[in-house]
Amino acid sequence: MKHKVGILGGTFDPPHLAHLRMAEEAKKQLGLEKILFLPNKIPPHKHISGMASSDERVEMLQLMIEGIDSFEIDTRELMRTGKSYTYDTMRDMISEQPDTDFYFIIGGDMVEYLPKWYHIDDLVKMVTFVGVNRPSYQTEVPYDIVKINMPETTISSTEIRNNIENASTFLPEKVWSYIKEHQLYGKK
């Protein structure tokens, strides 16, 4: 019997409670053994200035998932030079773990963008995409996507960075403390 592993990729700049809830709900609803958080270095679709360093983002992720044995961090995309493509990462993971079915978890904002992903026609044969509802985004695309139910949330890393003074309620307590201690996103 194959293992069932979820993957939640993103910049995690910063990681927030909606990321945690997405991972928990996907694990529970799909019966996944574990969730791999996959922070990326240079997402092909984003151009971000003022972002936290790779090390800071990994540290915040570690603080967020601390004590949850079935949640892990995979930093392979941070080690790459150039842009990070999910296709390349999944090709490598499948080669390393041929006895595993991978479930790639994406929010509504990414479902809408899915047809533009690099090698998407090959990628949909390699993984099962799991779409999580997000307000104001279309979740209908010409690919098979497993949808999971989750209370809708409007939390986004961009909004947190842009309104850092009022962000504590959207962040795990340890992540909020880290942001304050390291004065990230202009927080003093």
UniProtKB/Swiss-Prot annotation:
InterPro entries: Cyt_trans-like (IPR004821), NadD/NMNAT (IPR005248), Rossmann-like_a/b/a_fold (IPR014729). Transmembrane segments: none annotated. One of its GO terms (molecular function) is nicotinate-nucleotide adenylyltransferase activity. Its EC number is 2.7.7.18. It holds the Pfam family CTP_transf_like. Keywords: ATP-binding, NAD, Nucleotide-binding, Nucleotidyltransferase, Pyridine nucleotide biosynthesis, Transferase. One of its GO terms (biological process) is NAD biosynthetic process. It catalyses: nicotinate beta-D-ribonucleotide + ATP + H(+) = deamido-NAD(+) + diphosphate. It is an enzyme of class 2 (transferase). Pathway: Cofactor biosynthesis; NAD(+) biosynthesis; deamido-NAD(+) from nicotinate D-ribonucleotide: step 1/1. The keyword Lipid metabolism does not apply. Catalyzes the reversible adenylation of nicotinate mononucleotide (NaMN) to nicotinic acid adenine dinucleotide (NaAD). Belongs to the NadD family. NCBIfam families: cyt_tran_rel (TIGR00125), nicotinate (nicotinamide) nucleotide adenylyltransferase (TIGR00482), PRK00071.1-3 (NF000840), PRK00071.1-4 (NF000841). This is Probable nicotinate-nucleotide adenylyltransferase. The gene is nadD.
